[in-house]
Amino acid sequence: MIEQDRIIDANAKSREEQIDRAVRPKSLKEYIGQPVVREQMEIFIGAAQARGDSLDHTLVFGPPGLGKTTLANIIAAEMGADLKSTSGPVLEKAGDLAALMTNLEPGDVLFIDEIHRLSPVVEEILYPAMEDFQLDIMIGEGPAARSIKLELPPFTLVGATTRAGLLTSPLRDRFGIVQRLEFYNIEDLTHIVERSASLMGVAMDTPGAREVAKRSRGTPRIANRLLRRVRDYAEVKSDGTVTAQIADLALNMLNVDEHGFDHMDRRLLLTLIEKFGGGPVGVDSLAAAISEERDTIEDVLEPYLIQQGFIMRTPRGRMATQLAYQHFGLNVPAALKQDSLPGI
């Protein structure tokens, strides 16, 4: 896929998890941004510890790269528990989940990434495990098959997903805590970049960190990736210190503009404007026009463009906004100007 080569792709690339782990916060005190989530989790974790209970099962959702795995690690660390990690696509059979859960110790945190991709068979097994800490397993086949119940120790399930709408109601309803991660503001991202630079031994001033933050699409994973590339540029083209000017030169070289857009974003916006007259246009037609999959547009490209006000999602399809036209120095259609007038 084309977007896998994007430096601003919010999904983790191969080997990147190991690199990111080195700069990942280990506690809520180190956790930057997401103030509502941080405050709520401090209360929920503190209360569970005071009672001597496991934390309620927790669902974390939001766009990729915002720290869902990081939050799962922090929950385990704050609870003084071990973290066992897996993902929805890996758990193909009921036996896969049973093998994992029978090895849990009291208080353990089980993290299932991409939980929306669990198979229905595995999901059915998960219900009694979450609700009653029991595992129903079928032994044998055919008429001789019988069900046995296994008692599980109290544990906390942390589920992560980028597509909460795909979760079934029975699964979603079994989570006592539901947290949505939002895109980060520039101030918080600047602090994240400065912290990562310090841990990586990169000489960087605050204006340099802010320049990287501005182009990181509100996403810490992208910020850390851009930081590594800017560091490389500074070491080869300068004295190794990342200033605003060095960051600007490096990011321009990488074709990441002042809004954090790359060639894919610009292509999507220009296709919407030039081929479809600014819209509205259906997402399938848009996907065909740029030779991408529908899921790529909905999960990778659109969220940030919508959040920044460059695209509108309407019942009739996607539409380019005034900001999109202005970004490319194009004349804004009269209809868009009229729609934006007060009282219209």
UniProtKB/Swiss-Prot annotation:
Positions contributing to ATP binding: 24, 65, 68-70, 131-133, 174, 184, 221
Biological processes annotated in GO: DNA recombination; DNA repair
Region described as Head domain (RuvB-H): 258-344
Keyword DNA damage: yes
Protein origin, superkingdom: Bacteria
InterPro entries tied to this protein: AAA+_ATPase, AAA_lid_4, DNA_helicase_Holl-junc_RuvB, P-loop_NTPase, RuvB-like_N, RuvB_C, WH-like_DNA-bd_sf, WH_DNA-bd_sf
One MF term in the entry's GO annotations: ATP binding
Enzymatic reactions: ATP + H2O = ADP + phosphate + H(+)
Renumbered residue ranges of the record's region Large ATPase domain (RuvB-L): 4-184
Region forming the signal peptide: none
One Gene Ontology cellular component annotation held by this UniProt entry: cytoplasm
Known EC number: 3.6.4.-
Region (Small ATPAse domain (RuvB-S)): 185-255
Annotated localization: Cytoplasm
Keyword terms of this UniProt record: ATP-binding, Cytoplasm, DNA damage, DNA recombination, DNA repair, DNA-binding, Hydrolase, Nucleotide-binding
Binding positions for DNA per the UniProt entry: 294, 313, 318
Major localization class: cytoplasm
Binding site for Mg(2+): 69
Family label: Belongs to the RuvB family.
Domain notes per entry: Has 3 domains, the large (RuvB-L) and small ATPase (RuvB-S) domains and the C-terminal head (RuvB-H) domain. The head domain binds DNA, while the ATPase domains jointly bind ATP, ADP or are empty depending on the state of the subunit in the translocation cycle. During a single DNA translocation step the structure of each domain remains the same, but their relative positions change.
Subunit structure: Homohexamer. Forms an RuvA(8)-RuvB(12)-Holliday junction (HJ) complex. HJ DNA is sandwiched between 2 RuvA tetramers; dsDNA enters through RuvA and exits via RuvB. An RuvB hexamer assembles on each DNA strand where it exits the tetramer. Each RuvB hexamer is contacted by two RuvA subunits (via domain III) on 2 adjacent RuvB subunits; this complex drives branch migration. In the full resolvosome a probable DNA-RuvA(4)-RuvB(12)-RuvC(2) complex forms which resolves the HJ.
Alphabetized NCBIfam families for the sequence: PRK00080.1 (NF000868), ruvB (TIGR00635)
Biological function: The RuvA-RuvB-RuvC complex processes Holliday junction (HJ) DNA during genetic recombination and DNA repair, while the RuvA-RuvB complex plays an important role in the rescue of blocked DNA replication forks via replication fork reversal (RFR). RuvA specifically binds to HJ cruciform DNA, conferring on it an open structure. The RuvB hexamer acts as an ATP-dependent pump, pulling dsDNA into and through the RuvAB complex. RuvB forms 2 homohexamers on either side of HJ DNA bound by 1 or 2 RuvA tetramers; 4 subunits per hexamer contact DNA at a time.
Protein name: Holliday junction branch migration complex subunit RuvB
Organism lineage: Bacteria, Pseudomonadati, Pseudomonadota, Gammaproteobacteria, Cellvibrionales
